[in-house]
Amino acid sequence: MTTIEESLALIGRGTEEILKLDQLQARLATGKPLRVKAGFDPTAPDLHLGHTVLLNKMRQFQQLGHQVIFLIGDFTGMIGDPSGKNATRKPLSREDVLANARTYEEQVFKILDRERTEVRFNSEWFGQMSAADMIKLSAQHTVARMLERDDFAKRFGSQQPIAIHEFLYPLVQGYDSVALKADVELGGTDQKFNLLMGRGLQEHYGQAPQIVLTMPLLEGLDGVAKMSKSLGNYIGINEPAIDIVTKTMKIGDALTWRWIDLLSFDISMAEAARLKEEVASGELHPREVKLRLARELATRFHDAATAEQAIAGWHAVVTGQGDTGLLPLQEVVVPAEGLRLAGLLTAAGLTPSNSEATRKLKERAVKIDGEVVEDPGRVFTQGFEGVIQVGKRNFARVSLVTG
């Protein structure tokens, strides 16, 4: 049986802040399963590793015997979360929100235990709420309090517009906790204002206020900015295993430890500390630690056999040894007249633009089947198949087909 101290150690791993820790201890002491909530607005069709920081923490609560609520903000998604934004977000259509929500449902059970998960939509209660009810909810907070939020304060100070509906978002998110009778709510550090709103509203409606647990925002592949699709520094959980492995192996050595802390189930805190000491002493190469993390992530989102195949393919390319045929085949559609090499590199996702492709070619940083190529105007047509490599770690096994 897990003790309260052991539970708190697992819950606290990677956590930025717990409000209030004494209340969490008291609720754990009752022995009753807690209702642990995290909300996700379906603003894009796929989840990435940044989203899984919260999902991983939810999974840990499940391992301790608690019930988690994966809340899909199909209603709030149409408002648009203003947290951390310097301009009003464009609301999504109902159709976009529902389409994205369906993909979320398919993806979350790669991490969460289906038996201990409630999937809920906040349109369940907001779809029934009248205009009068919404006005009553709005009366629970003041404009002055809203302007204490850093993002709103900055926009107000710089005379950037703040739409009235953006003030509603924290209230609506907070009311979700009332509707779900949440004991704990998880969120990123940028969500703290909204999470605390839930505590206040629960007290107003006669409920015990939820414990707030904030998680750090995961740095993306660049090791600097928050992981984001718009920045291109992300790993999607639906990506091919070879992409998960390749991208993970590209991250900086310092970022590896951060990712282990927030993303790994297999490497305990004690083992991570030991591995760090071995790397510092030169006993262990940091690449081996990174490879272990890459294997774990590829296995989690695919399976062990697929992960090993991806690692073998990655190893074959970076060392020039082994069977590159183990790499998954990526089809690229080309016109009947073919595609110039610079365009091919871009179409295969190996460079962000033709100009960048041309620059890489001039640097002699491009290989096809192990041979350096330099001519950006070289034409490739249907039927070509080969391994194209840009730099040391960016590669793809490509087959050209006509549309």
Swiss-Prot record:
Catalyzes the attachment of tyrosine to tRNA(Tyr) in a two-step reaction: tyrosine is first activated by ATP to form Tyr-AMP and then transferred to the acceptor end of tRNA(Tyr). It is an enzyme of class 6 (ligase). Homodimer. Its EC number is 6.1.1.1. It holds the Pfam family tRNA-synt_1b. Residues 339-400 form the S4 RNA-binding domain. One of its GO terms (biological process) is tyrosyl-tRNA aminoacylation. ATP binds at residue 229. This is Tyrosine--tRNA ligase. Keywords: Aminoacyl-tRNA synthetase, ATP-binding, Cytoplasm, Ligase, Nucleotide-binding, Protein biosynthesis, RNA-binding. A motif ('KMSKS' region) lies at residues 226-230. One of its GO terms (cellular component) is cytosol. The lineage of its organism: Bacteria, Pseudomonadati, Pseudomonadota, Gammaproteobacteria, Lysobacterales. Belongs to the class-I aminoacyl-tRNA synthetase family. TyrS type 2 subfamily. It catalyses: tRNA(Tyr) + L-tyrosine + ATP = L-tyrosyl-tRNA(Tyr) + AMP + diphosphate + H(+). A motif ('HIGH' region) lies at residues 42-51.
